Amino acid sequence: MEAALQRFLPAPEIAPERLHRAMRYAVLGGGKRVRPLLSFAAGELALADPARVEVVAAAVEMIHAYSLIHDDLPCMDNDVLRRGKPTCHVEFDEATALLAGDALQPLAFQILAEHVLADSPGAQIEMLKILALASGSRGMAGGQAIDLASVGKALSLPELELMHIHKTGALIRAATVLGARCGSGLAPDEFERLERYAKTVGLAFQVVDDVLDCDASTATLGKTAGKDAAQAKPTYVSILGLARARALAEELRAEAHAALSPFGAKAARLRELADFIVLRKF
């Protein structure tokens, strides 16, 4: 995956050099790579060509990296640490960081458009649409808007879930679905099960993030711990308490496994990823 990202990103010596260095700084050398791993695992289940999945995985990771750059800016979460190193706007400057995020988003769609990923033009256009919807106001960006508007407010559990279905879950679902769409090995009912799995692990990822924000150190997380409570953000922990939030993560893991049950051993990697998402310590 790292080699693919290196290949798709602009070389640092190409003008504008500072912008390209910032883009590479934000994308390379860190992160769990959960979204690309989901793309590859779903692609394997759907008998997809790994070369196609690699393109999808890189595009999704670029969208994710752009979102992190913007989330960390002073006008949003105002964070100074990401993946164990200074955030992009700290390492470079705020304007360069903003532009790096702005440039990564269209680059993701550029590489999707430049490669044959599906067996028909219509199917490939649908893949572009899936990533666009997951990234925009009806997906990740919309979830961030809800998040910013919710600071200092008491949300109900359904309201919190709606926020994270958009903010975190949308791109995780897109990563999984796009990996599978690179292949043709799934029947419609199997695809529905995969989508159910993706929605469930997307929520589980956020529940665990909320738990770790309370329960892990900054050194372990590679980002500032305790930020949610300090900023009075509604979280699964603030609504449910730590023990109940942990239990919810386990319930979601069981749901994810259940969605995959008809696939048997073919879905082993997807099960492993559900386990990692819930059991991780960072």
Regions found by a protein language model. Give the residues of each.
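N-terminal amphipathic/basic leader segments beginning at the initiator methionine
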Residues: 1-10
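Mg2+-dependent prenyl diphosphate-binding active-site environment of isoprenoid biosynthetic enzymes
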Residues: 9, 13-257, 268-278
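Short cytosolic juxtamembrane segments of multi-pass membrane proteins
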Residues: 281-282
